[in-house]
Amino acid sequence: MLDIKNPIEARKVIRKNEYRNQTAGTANKYVQGNLCILPSKYAMDFASFCQKNPKPCPLIGFGTKGDPSLKDLGDIDIRTDVPQYRIWEKGKIIDEPYDIKKYWNEDLTTFVLGCSMSFELPLIEAGIPIQHIENDTIVPMYRTSIDCEPAGQFSGKLVVSMRPLNSKDAIRSIQISSRFPAVHGAPIHLGDPSEIGIKDIMNPEYGDPPKAFKNNEIPVFWACGVTPQSVLQDSKPDFCITHAPGKMLITDKLNNDLAAL
């Protein structure tokens, strides 16, 4: 884990390519974001997709065409300020670079979506253990059987993140995360993973496998901002750039600024 509390300093380290791993727990009072960068011909459809699917795709920022800065979110250069990226062509990953300078062009538009890491600090402050933070791993994420609402070219399956919790902590996590609708809000499911199409809880499509569940723990599932990557596989736009799962954009916005209560 990158143990830096200030988001500006964290981005400086990432910008210099001195840190390439997951960002959970880094600058943990500040909002982290999922990334999707698209050619302008897809921008309106993707914005509509986010509007129709606010649980997995809560839009917290977007850029203007051809501009790599995101002034509303901080002194950000989207070409360098994420630990690792994914380059997509027609639904397939063709590269996973540590910066996107050679891929950037004047026709690209950046979208930043809220991330569940923003409510993990309130969970920890409430005494709720977060397994992937304790183990310095990437939260496990799963492609479900739940369809997103389609918009234009974009359609596909919902992705969820999972945290093992005991029943008491699961109830408390619902109460706490409900305060943060801009970063996925309350869980969409808890308990039997097969009910949402997950065949093997120990084999996530994204992130790292969870450690063994304790006897009193159940899986708790939140809608996840990696959903666009699932949608890209199905919708197959000509070109797209995303973050690598778990390796997020760290912004200057405070988590508490997104709290609804």
Swiss-Prot record:
Species: Pelagibacter ubique (strain HTCC1062)
**NCBIfam families with a match to the protein in the record:** PRK05463.1
Entry's EC annotation: 4.2.1.-
Lineage, top ranks? Bacteria, Pseudomonadati, Pseudomonadota, Alphaproteobacteria, Candidatus Pelagibacterales
Q: What is this protein called?
A: Putative hydro-lyase SAR11_0660
The top EC class, named as a word, is lyase
Give a yes or no for keyword Coiled coil in this entry. Answer: no
Source superkingdom: Bacteria
Q: What is a single Pfam family found in this protein's UniProt entry?
A: D-Glu_cyclase
